[in-house]
Regions:
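Short glycine-rich phosphate-binding loop at a beta-alpha junction
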Residues: 50-61
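PRPP-dependent phosphoribosyltransferase catalytic core
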Residues: 3-6, 133-177
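Short Gly/Thr/Asp-enriched flexible loops that form oxyanion-binding sites at enzyme active sites
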Residues: 66-75, 134-137
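Acidic, divalent-metal-coordinating active-site segment for phosphoryl/phosphodiester hydrolysis
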Residues: 123-133
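Active-site-facing substrate-recognition patch
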Residues: 1-51, 109-112, 116
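Short, glycine/charge-rich flexible loops or terminal/linker lids adjacent to PRPP-binding catalytic cores
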Residues: 77-120
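Structural motif
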Residues: 55-56, 118-120, 148
Length: 177
């Protein structure tokens, strides 16, 4: 059953015991997608106004790209994409992430990373917080900071096992499932 943004939950996908949040209905409907992008932009203006001239948006592949790209465009902010290992052709900064059902290396273009000190993190789902925590830790090793983290939705059932992300100024989600 879709929620107010058109999201639906697919049980036991991609592995047994994991409930996958399907964002395709949201992406397929401009009447849902447009207001979501507008709301993200509004939250960034409200919660990171002091950083808008010096921050960049950072987002993990691949679903984060779908939200972060139009937001970066609308706000006139640079976009730095975090990719799985082997996808960055120029000077990759490589780090490791463990998430709820996988473990893998991620990478960021070192030249792009060097250009900014403050980041606004955007992703679709806030589940265990492992992706956010891994990127936050990788940035900290390079003296970079995430000042705001935004997610389309947070999985309420996982709030007690989320990674250590309390040092962030704000972690906001448009809704909780």
């Amino acid at each position: 059953m879709p929620n107010k943004y058109g999201l639906s939950i697919v049980k036991d996908f991609p592995v047994k015991g994991v409930n996958f949040i399907d964002i395709n209905p949201l992406l397929n409907n401009p009447e849902y997608f447009g207001p979501v992008i507008d709301r993200f932009c509004q939250l960034i203006r409200q919660n990171a106004a002091d950083y808008l001239k010096k921050a960049a948006i950072i987002t993990p592949q691949a679903r984060g790209f779908l939200f972060a790209s139009p937001i970066a465009y609308k706000l006139g902010l640079p976009l730095v994409c975090v990719r799985k290992k082997g996808k960055v052709p120029n000077k990759p900064y490589i780090f490791h992430i463990n998430n709820e059902y996988d473990s893998y290396d991620m990478e960021i273009d070192s030249d792009l990373l060097q250009q900014h000190t403050h980041y606004i993190y955007i992703d679709d789902i806030f589940a265990t917080g492992q992706t956010l925590a891994g990127i936050k830790e990788a940035l900290a090793k390079k003296q970079k900071t995430i000042i705001l983290a935004l997610h389309l939705t947070a999985v309420d059932a996982l709030k007690d096992i989320r990674s250590n992300t309390e040092a962030l100024k704000e972690i906001l989600s448009l809704e909780v499932i």
